[in-house]
From Swiss-Prot:
HAMAP family: RNApol_bact_RpoA. One of its GO terms (cellular component) is DNA-directed RNA polymerase complex. InterPro entries: DNA-dir_RNA_pol_insert (IPR011262), DNA-dir_RNA_pol_RpoA/D/Rpb3 (IPR011263), DNA-dir_RpoA (IPR011773), RBP11-like (IPR036603), RNAP_asu_C (IPR011260), RNApol_insert_sf (IPR036643). Keywords: Chloroplast, DNA-directed RNA polymerase, Nucleotidyltransferase, Plastid, Transcription, Transferase. Its EC number is 2.7.7.6. The keyword Nucleotide-binding does not apply. In plastids the minimal PEP RNA polymerase catalytic core is composed of four subunits: alpha, beta, beta', and beta''. When a (nuclear-encoded) sigma factor is associated with the core the holoenzyme is formed, which can initiate transcription. One of its GO terms (molecular function) is protein dimerization activity. Its main location: plastid. The N-terminal domain is essential for RNAP assembly and basal transcription, whereas the C-terminal domain is involved in interaction with transcriptional regulators and with upstream promoter elements. The lineage of its organism: Eukaryota, Viridiplantae, Streptophyta, Embryophyta, Tracheophyta. One of its GO terms (biological process) is DNA-templated transcription. Belongs to the RNA polymerase alpha chain family. This is DNA-directed RNA polymerase subunit alpha.
Length: 335
């Protein structure tokens, strides 16, 4: 085994990329180091970063397939080499790169004989395929294969259940995670009480994003989780009267929204959807999952209601207010 010489900073804490490679269209690898760290810090950061990489980054997958000619998932179609189940498993493996919010539709319509691959999928412009050569099916005879697909951007897993089945529609167990694996190791250096640590972080992705992009997204997600702690009032930071909560710094969302609500009659808020606003993807997805689709829906929610949304923070509420004020000015009729 050849020892690798790596130069690390002895003063300023910094990330450094020491290796990047593309093993295939669907397998990227990156290795990074963070140093110098005090004893124990590397393990803290390594655990948090690995969990954020594997659980917090969104990916895009096919989640449902519909075809009128299919009797059930385990049937076969005359003239096609693969069974319906095998075709579904092949579609499950297709890797997408997208700026998709929520779900969208796609389709395949080809005529045999010949091979059906990922490049035969007709997609909206904001979704693209990472590897066009991925195999889907082989048509042995001059027959038509037409299927409709539902594509979704999400995080984690989506396991199909009996309630998910619809007529002629077959859900697919989706693995949205674009990170194939993430590992970290810790190396110590120095003597005595001056021992320091280097954190090595390895990231494998499915090709829909690079290891550098994955590291950036995971870091951003972790920062978002800790932002509320930075806005606590210093004078209220200790627990008083046996209270077990620490109040956030006051942000008078309601007062500002009242001024905006006065303009309701002048603006068709019902017809202005939140995807027309300049909302960041994470905020948009959080609102949509809470059935907030229009600016009217948004204005009818209090700060307290918004803060109850999963993964929502006070900074998100402030950002929404800024965008709302800008948006309402844009849509106000000129006098």
């Amino acid at each position: 085994m050849v020892r690798e010489k790596i130069t690390v900073s002895t003063r300023t804490l910094e990330w450094k990329c020491v290796e990047l490679r593309t093993d295939s269209k669907r397998l990227y690898y990156g290795r990074f180091i963070l140093s110098p760290l005090m004893k124990g810090q590397a393990d803290t950061i390594g655990i948090a970063m690995r969990r954020a990489l594997l659980g917090e980054i969104e990916g895009t997958c096919i989640t449902r397939v519909k075809s009128e000619k299919v009797a059930h998932e385990y049937s076969t179609i005359a003239g096609i080499q693969e069974s319906v189940h095998e075709i579904l498993m092949n579609l499950k493996e297709i890797v997408f790169r997208s700026n998709l919010y929520g779900t969208c539709d796609a389709s395949i319509c080809v005529r045999g004989p010949g091979y059906v691959t990922a490049q035969d999928i007709v997609l909206p412009p904001y979704v693209e395929i990472v590897d066009n050569t991925q195999h889907i099916a082989r048509l042995m005879e001059p027959i038509n294969l037409c299927i409709r697909l539902e594509i979704e951007r999400n995080r984690g897993y989506l396991i199909k259940t009996p309630q998910n089945f619809q007529d002629g529609s077959y859900p697919i167990d989706a693995v949205f995670m674009p990170i194939r694996n993430a590992n970290y190791s810790i190396h110590s250096y120095g003597n005595g009480n001056e021992k320091q640590e280097i954190l090595f972080l390895e990231i494998w992705t499915n090709g829909s994003l690079t290891p550098k992009e994955a590291l950036h997204q995971a870091s951003r997600n972790l920062i978002d989780l800790f932002i509320p702690f930075l806005h606590m009032e210093e004078q209220n930071s200790h627990l008083e009267n046996n209270q077990h909560t620490v109040p956030l710094a006051p942000f008078f969302f309601h007062d500002k929204l009242d001024k905006l609500r006065k303009n309701k009659k002048e603006i068709a808020l019902k017809s202005i959807f939140i995807d027309q606003s300049e909302l960041p993807p994470r905020i948009y997805n959080c609102l949509k999952r809470s059935n907030i689709y229009t600016l009217l829906d948004l204005l009818n929610n209090s700060q307290e209601n918004l803060m109850k949304i999963e993964h929502f923070h006070i900074e998100d509420v402030k950002e929404i207010l800024g965008i709302l004020e800008k948006q309402l000015v844009i849509f106000l009729p000129k006098k």
